[in-house]
């Protein structure tokens, strides 16, 4: 097994949201003298407003310019405003449907489809209740205790299913036991998986931006790698719909990748395997990794998100992985009269 094939997923996970700290020209202004040059992400919602969305999560293997889809799952959700006050909104986020991707060509894709078929019936109908301020910024989740209980049960079921997979025996045969790592999983992180896309949709509510194009460079620090970023803010003067998009390119030194992955290898393998990894890495990896992130948000004039895209490509030695989350609205019922 080539060393760089092992580490691509780990690097992607560690840098997926690197654009969060690389946003130039972000500010908070509510009195805009020139509406044509500023967009404010503000929720103009009403009680009983309802939006449904499809969340499509996919991953691809990239090699020499060719891509092969390895996994995919689609989730249908519904957002409803249950109450509207001067101080903000009470809202509900409900899971309606889950679909696997039969075209995904990998063991991971097969396993993911197995989990979707087995566990989706336990999640469909689950609702997360939350509050926002008057601008639509999420301030509180009301029922995470219930979600935590469900998440723990689903994680245990997924773990049992994972143990049945042939790959587990293959890993053990070469001295690798990932069950140690899995048992250390943080349940809070699993709960975050329920709200991750919801947070993405409301990420910028409560902020305003100046229309235009912006470039920025960040030098390497003790906490962050050097990166180049681009921010684009667009406003349609006819519909007053608007969009925010960012691109970030980060270079991760080969020595840092080796240190990170070496630590993980040591966690669930013996000393000989750690030495083998180190030797193979030095022989094969001669370049730094490049992580490219693309993120975009499109909004209706009333502040409801219409599309959200988050995509990260991690490349090392001519091959890599591409992960994408794409959220698109399906039905829209807004401005309903109070009853």
Residue ranges and their predicted role:
Residues 1-30:
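Bacterial Sec-dependent N-terminal signal peptides
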Residues 23-339:
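Signature of exported/secreted
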């Amino acid at each position: 097994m080539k060393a760089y094939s092992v580490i691509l997923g780990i690097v992607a996970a560690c840098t997926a949201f690197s654009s969060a700290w690389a946003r130039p020209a972000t500010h908070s202004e509510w009195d805009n003298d020139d509406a044509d040059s500023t967009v404010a992400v503000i929720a103009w919602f009403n009680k009983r407003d309802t939006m449904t969305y499809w969340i499509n999560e996919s991953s691809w293997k990239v090699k020499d310019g060719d891509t092969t889809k390895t996994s995919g799952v689609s989730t249908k959700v519904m957002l409803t405003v249950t109450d509207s006050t001067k101080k903000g909104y009470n809202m509900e986020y409900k899971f309606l449907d889950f679909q696997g991707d039969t075209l995904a060509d990998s063991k991971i894709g097969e396993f993911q489809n197995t989990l979707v078929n087995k566990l989706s019936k336990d999640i469909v109908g689950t609702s997360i209740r939350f509050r926002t301020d008057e601008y639509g910024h999420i301030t509180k989740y009301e029922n995470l205790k219930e979600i935590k209980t469900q998440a723990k049960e689903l994680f245990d079921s997924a773990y049992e299913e994972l143990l049945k997979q042939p790959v587990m025996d293959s890993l053990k045969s070469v001295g690798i036991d990932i069950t140690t790592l899995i048992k250390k999983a943080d349940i809070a992180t699993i709960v975050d998986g329920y709200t991750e896309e919801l947070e993405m949709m409301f990420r910028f509510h409560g902020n305003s931006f100046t229309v235009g194009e912006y470039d920025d460079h960040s030098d390497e620090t003790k906490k962050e790698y050097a990166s180049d970023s681009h921010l684009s803010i667009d406003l349609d003067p006819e519909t007053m719909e608007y969009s925010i998009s960012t691109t970030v390119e980060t270079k991760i030194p080969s020595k840092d990748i080796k240190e990170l992955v070496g630590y993980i290898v040591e966690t669930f393998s013996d000393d000989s395997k750690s030495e083998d990894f180190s030797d193979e890495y030095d022989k094969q990896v001669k370049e730094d990794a490049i992580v490219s992130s693309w993120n975009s948000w499109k909004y209706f004039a009333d502040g409801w998100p219409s599309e959200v895209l988050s995509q990260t490509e991690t490349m090392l030695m001519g091959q890599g992985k591409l992960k994408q989350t794409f959220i698109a609205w399906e039905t829209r019922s807004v401005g309903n009269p109070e009853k």
